[in-house]
Amino acid sequence: MLAGARRLGLPRGGHLCWLLCAFTLKLCEAEAPVREEKLSVSTSTSPCWLVEEFVVTEECAPCSNFQIKSTPECGSTGYMEKITCSPSKRNEFRSCRSALMERHLFWKFEGTVVAVALVFACLVIIRQRQLDRKALEKVRKQIESI
């Protein structure tokens, strides 16, 4: 390359970085409207535990196969708890997250992170060996030319 010339564009791997950033932003934009819709539910049709004080009557327990298919509260997590609202004395169910499920999801996440780290560590080692071979080849050619 000439002394005054400079390289235009992104360095190697820069395109991949920008592509990853754009993809992540698209995912965030796709999830945002769903959250807004959930928050905009009117209070007249909302469950009593959103607007009143409540007492948990039955702790978080796994749903049966029938409940998962028939009860919307069971659909999202597979667990639900029974709640009694104090002022209106209404009994309702709400979805909940169990400690066992959270632990399982945590270890699944940790396993995925370790696996990805190992893959990238192997890629780094392979790339480093390639670069070392190229450097040794250049040095060998320089020594041979003397």
Swiss-Prot record:
Task: List all topological domains (Cytoplasmic).
Answer: 127-146
Q: What is the protein's name according to its record?
A: Protein JTB
Compartments annotated for it: namely: Membrane; Mitochondrion; Cytoplasm; Cytoplasm, Cytoskeleton, Microtubule organizing center, Centrosome
Q: Which organism is it from?
A: Brugia malayi
Organism taxonomic ancestry: Eukaryota, Metazoa, Ecdysozoa, Nematoda, Chromadorea
Residue ranges, Extracellular side: 31-105
Q: What is this entry's stated membrane topology?
A: Single-pass type I membrane protein
Q: Which segments cross the bilayer? A: 106-126
Keyword NAD (UniProt)? no
